[in-house]
């Protein structure tokens, strides 16, 4: 399942902050990583970086949010828009592929294909609503990639759909904008940076493992990004928008890392 909505109060500030610094340190190449960790793995180091007085749980929580924002910057800085995630042979596909959402399998949203329209708005020149037939008529590509969940598990699947960079160019999106946001039929929402949106493996997925995308995996479409953790891959997409205003996200607004790189 997704991370729990109500997180426990942080009681051991030193330990949690050290873990947070280690997470950030993963994204910094040696030798800079050593210097970062040596200078930062104390409450005083965090105070210098965030400007917070670390004296109680509330301050620790605020500091961790500041660290998450810092982590976003580090991940964005290190993200290579041309570096491909690993591709796997079809013999390694996980069958059945796991279902995962913030609700149970028996609560999967059913979307009517005939009436479905993908709404496109924001900094785009073509704002017409797309039918499923129009979307399926666009050139499709396959990828066999690994889905990595923030909870620690992973699974390999075969996803087919429209390269998102192709779609963004087709609708005349402002490719210099900062964000692309998504709204979904299950009330989920999230957003990504433009560099990830233009990554060659970011895909508007319409099919899974040779069949129309099943409802449990996000019919009528999901966004597949092997460069992001699972919670950044929205399902049941109904609307997308291009913007320079930070859109947030369902889990991100509850404290989870916004960049969410895998």
Curated annotation (Swiss-Prot):
Keyword Ribosomal protein among record annotations: no
Task: Name the Pfam families for this protein.
Answer: Oxidored_molyb (PF00174)
Listed A to Z, the keywords are:
Stress response
**Coiled coil, from the record:** none
Swiss-Prot/TrEMBL induction comment: Part of the SigF regulon, induced by chlorite under positive control of SigF. Part of the probable yedZ1-yedY1-mrpX operon.
What is the reported phenotype of gene knockout? Growth somewhat inhibited by chlorite.
Question: SUPFAM superfamilies from the xrefs?
Answer: Oxidoreductase molybdopterin-binding domain
Identify the Gene3D superfamilies for this entry: Oxidoreductase, molybdopterin-binding domain
The similarity comment for this entry is: Belongs to the MsrP family.
The protein's role, per its UniProt record = Part of the YedY1-YedZ1 system that may repair oxidized proteins containing methionine sulfoxide residues (Met-O).
Full protein name: Putative protein-methionine-sulfoxide reductase subunit YedZ1
């Amino acid at each position: 399942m997704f991370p729990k909505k109500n997180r426990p109060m942080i009681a051991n500030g030193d330990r949690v902050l050290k873990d947070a610094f280690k997470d950030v340190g993963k994204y910094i190449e040696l030798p800079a990583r050593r210097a970062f960790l040596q200078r930062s793995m104390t409450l005083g180091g965090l105070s210098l970086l965030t400007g917070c007085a670390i004296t109680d749980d509330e301050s620790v929580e605020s500091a961790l949010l500041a660290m998450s924002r810092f982590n976003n910057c580090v991940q964005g800085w290190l993200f290579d828009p041309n570096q491909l995630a690993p591709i796997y042979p079809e013999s390694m596909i996980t069958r059945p592929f796991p279902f995962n959402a913030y609700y149970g399998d028996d609560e999967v949203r059913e979307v009517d294909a005939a009436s479905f329209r993908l709404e496109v708005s924001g900094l785009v020149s073509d704002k017409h609503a797309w039918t499923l037939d129009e979307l399926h008529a666009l050139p499709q590509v396959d990828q066999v990639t690994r889905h990595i969940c923030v909870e620690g598990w992973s699974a390999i699947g075969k996803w087919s759909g429209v390269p998102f960079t192709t779609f963004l160019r087709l609708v005349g999106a402002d490719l210099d904008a900062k964000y692309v946001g998504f709204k979904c039929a299950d009330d989920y929402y999230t957003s990504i940076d433009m560099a990830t949106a233009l990554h060659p493996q970011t895909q508007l997925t319409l099919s899974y493992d040779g069949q129309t995308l099943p409802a449990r995996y996000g019919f009528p479409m999901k966004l597949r990004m092997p460069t992001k953790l699972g919670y950044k891959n929205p399902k049941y997409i109904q609307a997308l928008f291009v913007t320079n205003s930070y859109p947030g996200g369902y889990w991100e607004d509850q404290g989870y890392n916004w960049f969410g790189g895998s």
